[in-house]
Amino acid sequence: MLSINNPIVSKLGLSGLASVSLRPNAFARTLKIKTELLENNDRRKHNDTKFISHPMFPHPEWTNEEVEMVTPTHRVPKSTMDKAALRAITSVRTLFDIATGYKKPKTPEEIAHRFEGTRWEMNENKWLTRIIFLESVAGVPGMTAAFIRHLHSLRLLKRDKAWIETLLDEAYNERMHLLTFIKIGKPSWLTRFFIYMGQGVFCNMFFFMYLLYPRFCHRFVGYLEEEAVSTYTHLINDLKAGKLPKFDDVEVPEVAQQYWTELNEKSTFLDLVERVRADESKHREVNHTLANVDQKNDRNPYALKIEGTDKPQPEKGLKSKHPEGWEKEDLIL
């Protein structure tokens, strides 16, 4: 029997034992849901600059003052459907928080201490993981709903009254968010795996739900966007407090500069995140509004501004009178 004291084993085996003992740890390190913050040089090296086309849905220019005034709002559920949608998004949010190691601060003490020393403490890599997960899911509802409404229009031989355009614009916008952040961080293979799985499950569930209950789906997305605005507000507060120093030197990717035309090479990561939050706030308003109207007969109130009236109307800007969604009686349909 070979002993550890055997000269042959001591010469040949100890290094092997050491290497074997290290392998599980190295493998365990890869089995994490995480995203690596790329250095600026790495981002430039992997930057895709070939055959860049102009955005299909040009983004409106927003000033710093406009994006800074965006705040979290909540639409109080009024019907059973509203309550069901809110419960659904609360359940999804809870699972998402656990998966990404996130906890929403609720007290001044939690905001100040940021859960330091606990699994809930957020750093640059964890923020990127959460954002990329969020944006990979957020781009599904608009495209799925637009696809279904497109088929309805073809099958029923009638106009869609401009819902499709707004839904496609929303999906395109969310995808631009994702394309921007993957230029800043590199997700691990396990993170990508859960993105694949999450998209497959969510897309199919949303597809069938939209066929049956489109109003519920728009309310669900409205509450989802409420959570997105809340998350980005938390990130913005951490950035302004200097809690995430690695983000200070991040260069805004070219794809973001081309989409948000007011951004340039001197823009900061904070400038970028404020515009992403503003986008989410607009999706929040739009989807809550669409959930309030007749899904089959009413027009999309964001597609056309009615002339010759002093009555306030929805618009694409951020200065909305109803950030939590317009009621049907306030609209010209």
Region annotations inferred by a language model:
Residues 2-8, 13-16, 21-22, 26-333:
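Non-heme di-metal
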